Amino acid sequence: MATTKAGGSTKNGRDSHSKRLGAKLYDGQFAKAGAIIYRQRGTRVFPGVNVQRSGDDTLFSLADGYVKYENKRNRKYVSVYPAK
């Protein structure tokens, strides 16, 4: 015979790892070509000048320059403008 009763099982106790989403470069920071600017799920921020969107909606720089976040038509855009 068991000296203690059987312990109950739980269906909880799991969690996924955080995905580290959000801004990786902020307004005014210098971005090299290919640098990740914003990691996201869906299009919270849209690509602007010299910025492209990858398959997982990550925004990255196409040219060297300074990052600029802009609001246009109720959307947030991020652009990279070359240094003058």
From Swiss-Prot:
Residues 1-11 have a biased composition (Polar residues). Transmembrane segments: none annotated. One of its GO terms (biological process) is translation. SUPFAM superfamilies: Ribosomal L27 protein-like. GO terms for cellular component: cytosolic large ribosomal subunit. It holds the Pfam family Ribosomal_L27. Residues 1-20 are annotated as: Disordered. Keywords: Ribonucleoprotein, Ribosomal protein. GO terms for molecular function: structural constituent of ribosome. PANTHER family: LARGE RIBOSOMAL SUBUNIT PROTEIN BL27M, RIBOSOMAL PROTEIN L27. This is Large ribosomal subunit protein bL27. It comes from Mycoplasmopsis synoviae (strain 53) (Mycoplasma synoviae).
